[in-house]
Amino acid sequence: MRDWFFFPAALALVAMMVFLAIRPGIGALPSGAVAGDGANYNKIAIEGDYLHKIFAGGNAKTELVDGTDNKTLLYIEAETGALRDESELGPHFRLAADIEAQFSGMTVRITVRARPADDRGAMQIAMNYSAGRVGESGWRVFDLKPEFSDFSFDYDVPRIEGDQGVDYLGIRPVVPNKSRAVLIERITLDRTGPWKPEDPA
């Protein structure tokens, strides 16, 4: 076989093998833990296709849907009694180790922009920031409005003790009966500064 034929053919074969290897990732939606950019951790935003990083947990249903103005929304639906109290056992975002380290000992403002789903829309939404075994915010419940609105709470993230665990942000509709669903447009985590221990009484 002449070199003028062999080398271009070999190069084409290698290129095809590389393409076939990376093809499953082309166009794939983001998944896994939410991570920062390595530079600015004062504001972490989860929106658009990145809402796909949610873990359904329990028997909840989660999916991305198209909203108005070409916005990608997160749909979360659950049935009554289907979800346990722990954040990680229901719909939740897992926060990567870099965010956990950057948020340790900081006050973080969690803001979720949400509204009831068009069908079986929830009247309330519940959110919980869990820092694993060192503490959690507890479930914060908000009354939803017909239109997209921001719902926020502040949480003093405990300082890391020992080995790093995993932080979670749980988000779910409040389900008094049957099933309920919410639509999420955006989630932001704002690091507002270090919290100070309370003075002893």
Predicted regions and their residues:
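Extracellular carbohydrate-recognition regions
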Residues: 6-67, 196-201
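Beta-strand acidic-aromatic groove motif in beta-rich domains, primarily in extracellular
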Residues: 119-130
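Trp-centered recognition loops
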Residues: 107-109, 113, 145-153, 182-184
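Short carbohydrate-recognition loop motifs
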Residues: 66-89, 143
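Extra-cytoplasmic beta-strand recognition segments
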Residues: 95-120
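Extracellular beta-strand ligand-recognition surfaces/modules
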Residues: 153-191, 195, 199-201
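Extracellular carbohydrate recognition and processing domains
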Residues: 134-165
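Short beta-strand and strand-turn-strand segments in soluble, beta-rich domains
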Residues: 90-92, 130-139
